[in-house]
Amino acid sequence: MDFRKAFDSIRHDKLLQAVQQEGVKGNFFASIKSMYDSLLSCVRANNDYSDFFECPVGVRQGCVVSPTIFSLFINQLAKYITDTGRHGIQLLLGLTELFILLFADDVALLATTPCGLQNQLDSLKVCCDRLKMEVNKDETKVMVFRKGGHLSKHENGIMMALKWK
């Protein structure tokens, strides 16, 4: 799954809320908050600088804590799917269930049935709406793994019917 401008479009209020929900508090949270409160930027073209303008969205580029802060933010997707009781694939019978893979701004949902995948997509849509994240549908793909053979027309039709509502 591909998010449209994931690093550049995160609202700071949602970012700080996610950091706080992950248990960051005290002086460290205050430091992060101060980095994003009334963040100002300007544009340099050749040797000229624009006027400063407020930037209410995006993680700070080049900041050493930005990848960690973004990871805390994107982890909200996994937590939401877990909290809604969605199911993934069993790795160890009855012990380990895997339903989402996260790496930076890349997300892979894992399900054993098309219906299960649709349920995860529905949950993810609710969470993305809440976090104000936009999925790039044109860059998002479905991949099916199965034991042998090609997908039947029926199975292929089911996979094509999956929708980002």
Residue ranges and their predicted role:
Residues 1-165:
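Nucleotidyl polymerases of mobile genetic elements and RNA viruses
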